[in-house]
Amino acid sequence: MGGSILFFMKMNNNNILILKHLRNNARKNFSEISRETGIPVTTVFDNYQKLRKNKVITKHSSFIDFRKIGFFYRNFVFVKSRNKKELLSYLDDHKNINSVFRISTYDYLIDAIFPTMKEFYIFLDELRNFNIQKLEHHDVVEHIKKEEFFNE
């Protein structure tokens, strides 16, 4: 068994409570988590450090309403390419790509965010340089539920 599997098996209720509080609000400090859970603050701190060390917690970030900063066009792009390595490098460097997922059926699911539809279609034209076998894209009309798993 891998190290992360063993760590998961050792997860106790304290760790689960800490994770749920951080998923709900990553800016919550250890004292607040301690007060709300009844877990001693030193235990919260120690467990947090272990969760980071074992890469259970990998990053803290903020949710942004992209429309309020001028990015009005969001699209999910499904792509299958003969040039996977080059395509992935291009996507990794592209400033308008929020996330890339490796998926079945297609190679990648791309979460693309652009100021305008025109700029998005320029991006689609650029993708065709990577020997695309299959491409499908869908407009995001409304983001209804955002990062709610494991945060009760």
Give the residues covered by each predicted segment:
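A compositional/biophysical signature of low hydrophobicity enriched in polar/charged and small residues
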Residues: 1-152
